Regions:
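Hydrophobic anchor at the beta1->P-loop junction of P-loop NTPases
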Residues: 8
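P-loop (Walker A) phosphate-binding loop of NTP-binding proteins
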Residues: 11
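Conserved lysine of the Walker
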Residues: 16
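Hydrophobic positions on the alpha1 helix immediately C-terminal to the Walker A/P-loop
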Residues: 19
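Conserved substrate/cofactor phosphate-moiety recognition/catalytic segment
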Residues: 25-67, 102
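Conserved nucleotide-sensing/catalytic segment adjacent to the nucleotide-binding pocket
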Residues: 49-89, 111-112
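A glycine- and Lys/Arg-enriched "phosphate-lid" helix/loop adjacent to the NTP-binding pocket
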Residues: 100-175
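NTP-dependent small-molecule kinase module
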Residues: 151-247
Length: 247
């Protein structure tokens, strides 16, 4: 089976996890690759501080170490899931390309990583793209949100590893996401300034945007299965995606 990889992108606090949980419920024949945050949190020093905390507390010291770890653990999780899954659609909570075009690039250009570290990091990414899985073939869903709103959401969820995140950092991430994805022909941009967690209509609108993008990208419609939104239960107002072979 030729699996379609769709990566959910966006700033910290934009709502990627919520968006992915909605997709999991409403999208047939799909599997999810979560961001390897638990792996990062489990990697601790003698003071029981994990690498994520250490990175946010001292970005200059830990930038290369953390980006190298992020690169390797993303590769591991993506390839493990693709190899074990029988699903046609694989949704990623961020991709390897996110680090290359946003996080690592920003750290390097802000002088948090030196040139040698930058080149060493990109050796991994370039090898993966060339010999394993080319990220240019992905579809990207860019969840775009005002950095101030992202910061409020981060404070609300109260993760200890994120206590050091400030508005300037989120504004920089927003800029790099924009430069990478706003004019990317493989990307769909979705405005997430308003909460969509409990808005069924907005959720279905977002899913239809993804469906339309996949239809445009697909060259062989004879082998492509269209996805439609269909009301399954009128009383409960629940909707699901069903598949039917395109003509």
């Amino acid at each position: 089976m030729n699996k379609k990889i769709i990566s959910i992108e966006g700033n910290i606090g934009v709502g990627k996890s919520t968006f992915i949980s909605i997709l999991k419920k409403k999208w047939p024949n799909c599997d999810i690759v979560s961001e390897p945050v638990e792996l990062w949190k489990d990697l601790t020093n003698d003071d029981n501080k994990n690498i994520l905390q250490m990175f946010y507390e001292d970005i200059n010291r830990w930038s290369y170490t953390f980006q190298n770890l992020a690169c390797i653990t993303r590769m591991m999780k993506i390839e493990d899931k693709i190899n074990e899954s029988n699903c046609e659609y694989i949704f990623l909570d961020r991709s390897l390309a996110t680090d290359k075009h946003v996080f690592e690039k920003m750290l390097f250009e802000n002088n948090n990583m030196n040139l040698i570290e930058h080149k060493m990091y990109n050796l991994w990414c370039d090898f993966y793209d060339k010999y394993v899985r080319n990220s240019k073939n992905y579809t990207y869903i860019y969840l775009k949100c005002d950095p101030n709103i992202c910061l409020n959401r981060i404070k609300k969820r109260g993760r200890s590893e994120e206590e050091s995140i400030n508005l300037k950092y989120l504004e920089d991430l927003n800029k790099y996401h924009d430069e990478w994805l706003l004019n990317n022909e493989n990307a769909i941009v979705i405005d997430c300034n308003e909460s969509f967690e409990d808005d069924e209509n907005k959720q279905l609108e977002f899913i239809n945007l993804i469906i339309n993008k996949l239809l445009v990208q697909n060259d062989n419609l004879d082998e492509f299965y269209k996805l439609k939104i269909n009301k399954e239960n009128e009383n409960d107002n629940q909707k699901k995606i069903i598949k039917e072979k395109s003509l």
